[in-house]
Amino acid sequence: MQIGAQFYTIRDFTKDLDGLSESLKKVADIGYKTVQISGTCDFDAEWMKEELRKNGLKCVITHTAPAKITGETEKVIADHKTFGCDRIGIGFYDVAKNGVQAFIDYYKDAAEKIKQAGLRLSYHNHDAEFVKIDGKLIMDHIIDAFAPDELCITLDTYWVQSGGGDPIWWLNRLKGRTPCVHFKDMAFTGKERHMAVVGEGNMNFDGIIKASVDNGVEYALVEQDNCYGEDPFDCLKRSYEYLKAQGLE
């Protein structure tokens, strides 16, 4: 299992191409070989291909705007193939508000086209997916509505726990369907929970790492939505060093 950097962590530094280019270099200098491109400025696919090449990086998944996934599916597929990325990610969809059927209707055709092109659509959870609709968790509704080769899950460990779920149980439940997982820790100050550098919070990352390996996770993508005034690159570095010490590459 390889350690990766989720660029949403450093989104404030990637608002233009110069910042994105510099951020790719800084992440590579930390030691990362794998990235998820998310929350950045727009870029040309050929430009990204070259930036990844010169920094020795591979993009294994993106978060792509929903309107592009469904309205410009062929272009999104072509762009991902250009810079060598096999997975097109959905960062957020308000299933609790819009309903499960609306989610299915919105993404089903795109999921099929992406599958036929040899890529995979992937859904990233937050905590709302652990609300029940008609006696069934939203996450289960989503999983059951799509075949594994139509939709994989970018399981976010922090948001699973925030929603009252057990990340290890869900890694077991989704065996073979979670090639990419977001590693994000949770800590508490008093009664207030907050996101933390991996290994510096309270989550059972020994167990999460073991379950990830046992269930075929390929990429552990470090994400920290909020660094609370700390340098996000330093947070990425500390998470990387912790995971390296646990035997990840």
Model segments located where?
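Acidic-and-aromatic substrate-binding clefts and catalytic sites of carbohydrate-active enzymes
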Residues: 11-17, 34-47, 64-73, 93-101, ...
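Structural motif
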Residues: 29-30, 83, 117, 176, ...
